[in-house]
Amino acid sequence: MVPPNPAHQPARRTQPQLQPQSQPRAQPLPGRRMNPVLCIIVALVLLGLLVGLAILITYLTLRPKRLIYTVEAASVQEFAIGNNDDHINAKFSYVIKSYNPEKHVSVRYHSMRISTAHHNQSVAHKNISPFKQRPKNETRIETQLVSHNVALSKFNARDLRAEKSKGTIEMEVYITARVSYKTWIFRSRRRTLKAVCTPVMINVTSSSLDGFQRVLCKTRL
C-alpha cells in the first residue's frame, strides 16, 4: 500500500488564537469624608449630653434638705398702744436658731429680713448681715425689732389690747432670705428661703424668758 503523499493532502485550517482579555481592575473606593455640618451636629449633641449630665450630678449633689428654724426666746419691752390713734410702740426681742442639717453642703446667706406681725399685719422688721453656715452648723440670731408709732388696723388694735389685758400677746415671726448652697467646687443659684413662725406667745407683764415655749417654724425654699 502506497503511503499518502503529504503534498496532496489538504491544508488544515488554523483556528485564530484568541487574545486573552484583560480583566478590569477593581478601583479603590475613595475615602469617605464626613460632612462638616454633621460633625458639628454630633459635637453639639455630645456637648449637650455632657452638660445635662453635669447639671444632673450637680442637682443631686446640691439638692438641699429643708433648713430648720426655731424661735428659742421672745420678749417685749415698752409695749404700748395709743387709745386714740391705734398706733403701737414696742421693742420685740427674738432669739432665732437656724440649723443646717446637710453633711457636706454649706449655706451662704446673702441677705436676710426678719419681721414680726400680728394677724399678718407687720409692725416691725430688721435686716440681718450676710453670714455663712457650715454643714451641721447651728446659728443663733439675736435681734430686736422696734415698732415706732406704727398704725394698726382697728381690729388688730382692739385684739392686741384684749390680749395685753390677759398678760400674753400672740405674734408671728417671718423670715425671708436669699441663700445659695455650696459643696466642693459646685455652687447653686440663689434661692429665696421663707420661714413662718407662729404662734409666738409673748409675756407682756415681764421681760423674763422663763416659761417661753419654743416655736418650730415652717420653711419653704
Swiss-Prot record:
Transmembrane segments: 37-57
Coiled coil: none
Its membrane topology: Single-pass membrane protein
InterPro entries: LEA_2, NDR1-like
Primary location group: membrane
A GO BP annotation: defense response to other organism
Keywords (A to Z) from UniProt: Membrane, Transmembrane, Transmembrane helix
Polar residues: compositionally biased ranges: 12-25
Positions of the UniProt region annotated as Disordered: 1-30
Localization (cell): Membrane
GO CC terms, sorted: membrane
Record flagged with keyword Transmembrane: yes
One Pfam family in the UniProt entry: LEA_2
PANTHER family (alphabetical): HARPIN-INDUCED PROTEIN 1 CONTAINING PROTEIN, EXPRESSED, LATE EMBRYOGENESIS ABUNDANT (LEA) HYDROXYPROLINE-RICH GLYCOPROTEIN FAMILY
Protein name: Uncharacterized protein At1g08160
Upper taxonomic lineage: Eukaryota, Viridiplantae, Streptophyta, Embryophyta, Tracheophyta
